[in-house]
From Swiss-Prot:
Gene name in the database record: ERT1
Species in which this protein is naturally found: Mycosarcoma maydis
Main function: Transcription factor which regulates nonfermentable carbon utilization. Activator of gluconeogenetic genes.
Keyword Transcription regulation attributed: yes
Region ranges (Disordered): 1-172, 196-331, 464-509
A GO cellular component annotation in the UniProt record: nucleus
Family annotation (Gene3D superfamilies): PAS domain, Zn(2)-C6 fungal-type DNA-binding domain
Subcellular location: Nucleus
Compositionally biased residues, Low complexity: 42-67, 89-117, 142-162, 233-254, 288-297
Record-given protein name: Transcription activator of gluconeogenesis ERT1
Length: 721
């Protein structure tokens, strides 16, 4: 059997030429029954051992592809049964050949002139494994290359080293690889830039330095660069912003464009829609004409929708809108360039929304008392849109009314009444024969532009006109408009109408609006003054520590006179739970500490008063000894007790017996508990007439800076069912 196996394992020597000397050798430790001379006398056995070493060092073949058998080696039955992995069967066969002491004469004759280091069987196995799995052969031959006697690297190891050098991460990536977040190499130009055709611009990328690592000079340079970029951006925006001449020329271009038919292109329709809106903007900011009676070049943008008519004194809304060509009823004085959104469409949309929310509705202007000359003169009281995004009053319409304007019916009174709370402004009408409007800019001066008249305003003051014409009392002559405008800049007086031309039906409206604005401002100022005085009084008065022990003495007297002995014992037990901790925390406190705690308590009460005034829930705030300090108006309505009757008394005086007992037991349990300081339960309140009000309520225990229970906030809701 051993001779037959030797015949099967006898290799057929191929001709390799000069490549035979460059092939690395393999070796196995000798079997205990085989000596070194015996291995030299059996080349076939040594070739099988070399093949076994090669197979043992190579990874197993995948399950999907069966590894082929070496040449001249027939598969055994065990290998045929497991064709998906022929390595175990081949190994067993080679082990039998390796440690077999006999070999056939044919095998000895075939391998007589071949040295063990240059076995053709091992070379054929190597070639077959290389053809099957190149990656496996590379990993197999890479190991003996390092331990070979010649020391010459194989091509597979050279390719591996070159591949690993390509995948090696560079110390600093080039600019293009850094932007693309790809792995670069140390060569310049790098391989990726060469492939992409970017070899000329391949350079080391700049690493952004952290701000905390920058020096003072670098920080200053960075700040200057940011300022320069910001200035350049503003310059570009100002350069791209249309000038007043261009804005005035847009309506004429629009009229000429409307007269010629255009293609129904979506982009052209969108551009025309935007241009039409911008034309309305241009009309809103146009300056008044130089003539005393003539309207401004774009005054029709506002006045065409005005429901005034010279013949019948007024028209309906549909007719006014049809005469205007579908103009919107609100003010469209907006400029997209004032909003820095980076997109013209976004800025335009924001400007439109701001104008819709804050503009003036021209349909609110009355029609009584209008003269035929009103249609030919710009309307005073029409206000441009308020630029809320910029936080300033961008513009107030500087078109002065020459004749016949009703102050109460104008849009300015309505807008001033609407924005009186936020902008702290108002309007008034001075009984003077002429009218005018001051040009108001943004900033602090804009907030004081429209003021409520004081008693110092007399009828001796001369009117101020901003228009370039119509300076006399009748409005028919021409005056020095520029000098009067400069005088208007020095005075904060606004004249909105002529007493001889006012409509008597609108005088009460203007007077009521002015009185309401003035009273609201005065009330707000009084509240602020009282609030500041109360805060100052808290820190200025000689505050004494609050006598808390008297509160507990009053509690014992109250429950002894009202409740039975068992109920009194329940309250005493509740007090015994938390009073020792309370006394222990108060022991190290000095008198100054107690004064500080009392001032903090009084200052906190002021904040609770403000908070409760904003809430609609019946709320009461009391001390830890139940003295009521703050009462909400809703609690007074719920219990029918007045605020004066509640202040200074104890909260348990307005509860029934069971509610009082439950409150003290819950307070004793949660007074010094850190997990839960709020309790939700039910109670029953007592009205002055003795009726009971069942309520669901919650109380929260607040502590001071020394971790003492300082106050309790109670919220009550009546149970209606």
């Amino acid at each position: 059997m051993s001779s037959a196996k030797g015949d099967k394992l006898a290799p057929r020597p191929p001709s390799y030429g000069s490549n035979q000397s460059a092939t690395p050798t393999y070796s196995l430790p000798p079997h205990p029954s085989t000596t070194y001379p015996q291995r030299h006398q059996s080349p076939a056995s040594h070739a099988a051992a070399s093949t076994l070493a090669a197979l043992a060092s190579s990874p197993p073949a995948s399950s999907s592809t069966a590894s082929p058998h070496p040449p001249n080696v027939l598969p055994t039955p065990s290998s045929a049964s497991t064709s998906y992995n022929a390595r175990p069967s081949t190994t067993s066969t080679l082990n039998q050949s390796l440690y077999s002491s006999s070999a056939s004469p044919a095998a000895k004759a075939a391998t007589a002139g071949i040295s063990p280091s240059g076995s053709p069987l091992r070379k054929e196995v190597h070639m077959s494994s290389t053809k099957q799995t190149p990656a496996a052969s590379t990993s197999t031959l890479a190991k003996p290359a390092s331990s070979s006697t010649t020391g010459t690297p194989t091509p597979s190891s050279a390719s591996k080293e070159s591949g690993s050098s390509k995948r090696k991460k560079a110390t600093r990536a080039c600019l293009h690889c850094q932007k693309a977040h790809l792995t670069c190499d140390d060569s310049r130009p790098c391989q990726r830039c060469v492939k992409k055709g970017l070899a000329e611009s391949c350079m080391d990328g700049r690493r952004k330095k952290a701000k905390y690592l920058l020096d003072d000079d670098e920080l200053e340079e960075l700040r200057r660069q940011k300022e320069a970029k910001k200035a350049a951006k503003q310059a570009v925006q100002q350069k791209n912003a249309p000038s007043p001449q261009q804005r005035q020329s847009r309506p004429s271009q629009q009229d000429s464009a409307k007269s010629t038919p255009q293609n129904s292109d979506p982009s052209s329709e969108k551009a025309s829609a935007v241009s039409s809106i911008l034309d309305q903007v241009a009309g809103s900011i146009a300056t008044p004409s130089s003539s005393g009676h003539g309207p401004s070049p774009h005054a029709h943008d506002y006045l065409s929708s005005n429901p005034f008519d010279s013949s019948n004194g007024g028209v309906d809304d549909t007719q006014a809108s049809s005469n205007n060509g579908g103009a919107l009823p609100f003010d469209l004085s907006f400029d997209p360039s004032t909003h820095n959104f980076g997109s013209e469409a976004t800025s335009l949309e924001y400007s439109i929304l701001s104008s819709m929310l804050n503009g003036t509705d021209l349909q609110l202007m009355g029609a009584s008392g209008a003269s035929p000359d009103l249609q030919a003169s710009p309307a005073v009281g029409v206000m441009n849109g308020w630029n809320i995004a910029s936080g300033e009053l961008d513009a107030i319409l500087n078109i002065s009314m020459q004749q016949n304007q009703v102050p109460g019916a104008g849009g300015m009174d309505t807008v001033a009444a609407t924005y009186s709370d936020t902008a702290d402004m108002g309007v008034y009408a001075d009984p003077q024969p002429n009218t005018g409007l001051q040009d108001v800019g943004g900033g602090d001066s804009a907030l004081n532009a429209l003021e409520v008249p004081s008693s110092q305003c007399t009828a001796k003051e001369e009117p101020i006109l901003l228009s370039s014409g119509s300076g006399n009392g009748n409005g028919n002559g021409s005056g020095s408009g520029s000098g009067e405008a400069q005088q208007a800049g020095s005075n904060n007086q606004v004249d909105l109408g002529s007493s001889s031309q006012r409509s008597t039906s609108n005088e009460p409206v203007a007077a009521d609006i002015n009185r309401a604005i003035a009273s609201r401002r005065v009330a707000r100022q009084q509240q602020d003054t009282i609030w500041r005085a109360r805060i100052a009084k808290t820190y200025r008065d000689n505050t004494a520590p609050f006598p808390y022990p008297e509160g507990y003495h009053f509690l014992i007297k109250y429950v002894t006179s009202k409740y039975e002995k068992q109920d009194v014992l329940r309250i005493v037990r509740a007090l015994a739970i938390f009073r020792p901790s309370l006394i222990a925390l108060q022991m190290p406190l000095t008198e100054e500490d107690e004064i500080f705690v009392e001032r903090s308590f009084q200052r906190t009460m002021l904040e609770f008063e403000k908070l409760i005034s904003f809430s609609g829930t019946p709320t009461v705030v009391w001390r830890r000894t139940c003295e009521i300090c703050v009462v909400g108006a809703e609690f007074c309505m719920l219990t029918q007790w007045s605020k004066d009757q509640l202040m200074g008394r104890r909260i348990y005086e307005f509860m029934d017996k069971n509610s009082t007992l439950d409150y003290w037991e819950n307070f004793a349990q949660h007074a010094f508990e850190n997990t839960t300081q709020s309790v939700m339960t039910t109670c029953t309140l007592v009205k002055p007439d003795g009726k009971l009000v069942p309520c669901a309520w919650s109380f929260t225990i607040k502590r001071d800076i020394f971790d003492l229970p300082s106050l309790v906030v109670g919220n009550f809701l009546p149970i209606l069912s």
